Swiss-Prot record:
The keyword Membrane does not apply. GO terms for molecular function: NADP binding; shikimate 3-dehydrogenase (NADP+) activity. Shikimate binds at residues 14-16, 63, 88, 103, 221. This is Shikimate dehydrogenase (NADP(+)). GO terms for biological process: amino acid biosynthetic process; aromatic amino acid family biosynthetic process; chorismate biosynthetic process; shikimate metabolic process. Its EC number is 1.1.1.25. It comes from Caldicellulosiruptor bescii (strain ATCC BAA-1888 / DSM 6725 / KCTC 15123 / Z-1320) (Anaerocellum thermophilum). GO terms for cellular component: cytosol. The lineage of its organism: Bacteria, Bacillati, Bacillota, Bacillota incertae sedis, Caldicellulosiruptorales. Homodimer.
Length: 288
């Protein structure tokens, strides 16, 4: 049996194994996907050494906090990873480790599903880590020309200017000044508000008087409706959580590992529905 992993920290509540194993079962692939918590970069190094030696390991996903650290252990990177400088998917092929990023694809497709147009919009991204980089790259691929970025450590937001200098304009915003500008779209890429700290929010809409956004997105999927999204919804703003992004990026990763094609139109909704039944998270219905 082939092996796949999700590596990172604090994976206790991750539903990625359920989603990936659901995909593997759908296509009768003899493989299993498991979580593996790594406490530090030394454990990351040991894991990579194990992957290279174990012929049954096909690849793995990476989540917080190793999406950037993993690059030094990979032999080749895709074009989007070269730009983003963060990877969430690695495939082992002919003894080499190849790094990809499917996060931006999942993010982009989930926005497209909602009919969100980012062209000529004022967009604020909260956070500046690997998830933020994938988000910004996805926005660029959808036609965005500039993005405001607010991070608690201003210098980290400032560094994104260099990362994306060749493709779009990054406008760093000091964390305490994030309420001073009018935005059409606000996107949270931080872990603030994630289970179990569900009362926390990275943005206080009661303090935001510069204008009302038309769309608010939270990459968090547990809970499905974070405090951030609840506050936005009370203001009449359209909202979206990160569950569709999670499923879309998982499907893209499986396509990289196993060349899966011909997904049924309802397959995404079937997985979302299965997630609802098994975890009490979902709010989606299968169509047709």
């Amino acid at each position: 049996m082939k092996k796949l992993f999700l590596i990172g920290k604090s994976l206790k509540h991750s539903i990625s194994p359920f989603i990936h194993n659901r995909i593997l079962s759908e296509f009768d692939i003899d493989a299993i996907y498991s979580n593996l918590e790594l406490l530090d970069t030394e454990m990351l190094k040991e894991f990579v050494e194990m992957v290279r030696k174990d012929e049954d390991v096909v690849g793995f996903n990476i989540t917080i906090p190793y999406k950037e650290d993993i690059l030094e252990f990979c032999d080749e990177v895709s074009e989007d990873v070269r730009i983003i400088k963060a990877a969430n998917t690695v495939k082992k092929e002919d003894g080499k480790l190849l790094a990809y990023n499917t996060d931006w694809i999942g993010f982009k497709r989930s926005l497209e599903d909602r009919g969100v147009d980012v062209k000529d919009k004022k967009i604020l991204v909260l956070g500046s880590g690997g998830a933020a980089k994938a988000c910004i790259y996805g926005l660029y691929r959808m036609g965005a020309k500039e993005v405001f970025v607010a991070n608690r450590t201003y210098e980290k937001a400032e560094k994104l200017k260099e990362v994306f200098q060749d493709i779009l304009k990054i406008l760093p915003v000091e964390w305490l000044r994030r309420y001073e500008f009018k935005y059409d779209i606000i996107i949270n890429t931080t872990s603030v508000g994630m289970f179990p700290n569900i009362e926390s929010s990275p943005f206080d809409f009661e303090n935001y008087v510069a204008g009302v956004p038309v769309f608010v997105y939270d990459m968090i999927y547990n809970p499905l409706k974070t405090a951030f999204l609840k506050e936005a919804e009370k203001k009449g703003i359209k909202i979206e959580n990160g569950l569709k992004m999670l499923v879309y990026q998982a499907i893209e990763a499986e396509m990289i590992w196993f060349d899966i094609v011909n997904l049924s139109p309802n397959f995404l909704l079937e997985i979302l529905n299965d997630t609802e039944k098994n975890f009490g998270l979902g709010i989606y219905k299968v169509i047709g």
